[in-house]
Every structure is written in C-alpha cells, then in structure tokens.
C-alpha cells in the first residue's frame, strides 16, 4: 500500500504533515511559507481500482474527501493550533476525550 504523501499540493494549497501516529495525522495547510490553517485527519485505506480500459490504481492511503470532514477530518484556523493538537491527541486515543 502506498503511504499518504507527507507534502502535496491540492486546490492551490500546500499540505505538510506535521505529525502522524498510526492512521491519524496533523497537516498544515497554506501557500508557500504562510500557514492558513491545520487539518487533523483519519487516514483511509483505499483498495486497488481497475478502470475501464484496464488502468490499475494501486492500493494507497487516502485523505478524507470534502464530505468526510466532521467525521474523518477536522479543519482549524491558523490561530487554533492548540485545538488542532488536542483533536490530534483525541483521535490517536480512538476519539476519546482527555
């Protein structure tokens, strides 16, 4: 299984993994060296797909899609790093509060 990238660009934002424990990760999100916010995610396992025409997409780890935020992903403003860190800790404990 291909692991989720530690840095990637999506929709004009640069995502950088700050920490990861198991299938939970904390990413910064922004442009260049400016951080606009943080995202705590539960990483998905995406199975191999075979497309029409025979192209194969190997099994890989995936980022939650837009519809999964609030369930598998949480966004925090730039000033909310403490809240993002707390959510990261909570998710690494299986969603249990401190």
Name the predicted role of every residue range.
Residues 1-62:
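Short N-terminal "domain-start" leader segments
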Residues 1-3, 90-98:
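Short intrinsically disordered terminal tails
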Residues 33-40, 67, 83, 98:
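Short linear motifs in intrinsically disordered/low-complexity regions
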Residues 46, 82-84, 96:
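Amphipathic alpha-helical interaction segments
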Residues 63-83:
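A short, exposed loop/beta-hairpin motif centered on an aromatic-Gly-Thr core
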């Amino acid at each position: 299984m291909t692991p989720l990238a530690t840095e990637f660009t999506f929709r004009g934002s640069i995502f950088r993994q700050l920490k990861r424990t198991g299938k939970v990760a904390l990413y910064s999100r922004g442009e260049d060296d400016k951080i606009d916010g943080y995202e705590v995610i539960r990483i998905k396992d995406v199975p191999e797909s075979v497309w029409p025409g025979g192209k194969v997409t190997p099994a890989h780890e995936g980022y939650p899609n837009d519809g999964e935020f609030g369930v598998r992903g949480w966004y925090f403003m730039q000033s909310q790093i403490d809240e993002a860190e707390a959510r990261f800790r909570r998710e690494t404990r299986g969603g249990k509060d401190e």
